[in-house]
Amino acid sequence: MVQRAPWRERASWALYDFANTIFSMNVATLYFSVWLIKDLGASSTLYAIGSDISSILVVLSVPFLGALSDARRRRKPWVMWFTIVSCIACAAIGVLGQTSIPVIGAQTINGAGAGGWHPGFHSLFWVIVAFTIANYTYQAAQPFYNAMMADLAPPEEHGRLSGIGTAVGYVGTIVGLLLVSPFFGGELPLVGPLPQGLVAGLRTWIPFTSHAGRVSTFVPTALLFLLFALPLFVFCRDHHPVLEKTAISWKRAFGDVLNTLRDARKYPGATSFILASFLYQDAIGTIVSFMAIYAIKAMHFPDGTETTLFLVLTVPAIFGSYLAGYLTDLIGPRRTLLFTIMAWVVLLIAMILVPSQKGFWGVGLLIGLVFGGVPTAERPMLLSLIPREEAGRFFSLMLLSSRAAAVAGPLIWGITVDVLEPLRGTGTAYRAAVITVVAMFALSLLLLRRVPETRAVRH
C-alpha cells in the first residue's frame, strides 16, 4: 500500500508543473511561433517541421528510456537532466536570436515583408535546432515526472494531487507571463508600461535581453523554468530504486513497446485509452502551438496583446484544474475526461463561429475553464488501468503515442493554412485548421466510450 509522501515532497512535485508550464506557455505557445512566423516571416510549415522533429525524437528515444527507468525504478534523474538541457536550449534561442538574426528586437515587431529583409537559412536553421532540442527535452521529461506521482499519494488521492499539480502549473503560467512580459514590451499586461529605468535595469541584469521584442523572452523563460524546478531536484526522491545496473538495448526497448501494447490488452480499457490519448493530446498540442498566431491572424488582435489574452484565459484554468481533480476523485477519471473533451468540441466549434473579438474572449474564458481537465484526469485514469509498478513504461507508451500523433497535427494545421490562405483568405484558412482539431477530439471521444469505469489503482 502506498503511503502519502511528506508534504514537502508532494509540494515540490507539484511545483515542477509550475516550472514546466512557464516554458510551455512562453515558448511553445506564446512567443516562439509568433516570433518565427510573424516577426521573421517564416512559414507555418517550417515551425511545424521543428515541432514534428522534436516529436519524432521522443518517439525514437522514450521507449528505451522508459524501459531503463522501469528496470531501475529511477525517475528523478531523467526529469532533472532533461529539464537542465531544455533550459540551456531555450536560452540558446534567445542568444542565437540576438546574435545571428540581422534584424532583432523591437525592429522585428512589424514583421518581415516581401519587400523587406529576410533572415538567412543558416540563421533560421540554428534557431530551429535550439527550439527542437528545448521542445524535445521538455516533452521527454513528462513520462518520468508523471510516473513519480504513483509513489507520492495513495490511489484515492491521485485525482486531487494531479489537480493540484495542474492548477499550480497554471499559476506558473500567470507568473511566467508577468515576469517575462517586461522583457518583450517593457510593460505588464493589464497594468501598462513600466518605468524605463526599471526595464533598463532588468535588461542589464539578465543577459541577452537588451533588445525589445519576443527575442528577449527566451533567456528569462529558461531561468524561471530552472529556478522553479530546483525543489523537485532537491526534495523529491525515488522511493524504490534498484541499485544494480541493468543493461537495456534499443532492440529490447522497442521490443518492450510491442510487449507493452500486448500487455495493455490484459488490462480492460488500457488500449482504447492509449489510442484516445494519441488523438486528444495531438489536438491539444496543436491548439496550444497555434493559438497565439490564430488570435492575431484570424481574430485580428493587435500585435502584442496575445500576452494579455493568455494571461486572462489562464485564470479560469487554475480553478478548472482543481475542480477537475475533485471531480476525478468523485465521479471517476473516465467521466471527467469524457465531459472535458465534449466541452472542447463544443467550444472549438463556437470559436470558429464567433465573428467578434468579444465573442472570442467569451469562448476563450470557457476554454480556459476546461483546459486543465485532460492532464488532471488522464494521469489517474492510466494509473487506474494498470499495475503501479508498470507506470513508467505505460506513461512512456502514452507519451509515445501522443508524440507520434503530434507529428501529424501541427503539420496538418500548417499545410491547411499555407494552402487555403492564398485561395480563401487568412480567416477561412485558420478556421479550417481548427476544424481538423475538432475532428481529432471527436475521434478520441469514440475511443474513450470503450474504456470501463475504474476507481482504484491496480496493484
What residue spans do the PLM features occupy?
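Hydrophobic core of transmembrane alpha-helices in multi-pass small-molecule transporters
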Residues: 83, 89, 95-96, 102-141, ...
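Intracellular juxtamembrane helix-capping segments at the cytosolic ends
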Residues: 140-153, 373-387
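Helix-loop boundary and gating motifs at the non-cytosolic
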Residues: 2-59, 269-302, 306-309
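Juxtamembrane intracellular "pre-TM" segments in multi-pass secondary transporters
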Residues: 1-10, 238-275
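Structural signature of the two symmetry-related core transmembrane helices
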Residues: 77-92, 335-350
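Multi-pass alpha-helical transporter architecture, strongest
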Residues: 10, 94-97, 224-235, 435-459
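A membrane-interface helix-boundary motif in multi-pass transporters
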Residues: 184-223, 415-440
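Helix-to-loop junctions at the C-terminal end of transmembrane segments
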Residues: 60-74, 319-332, 417
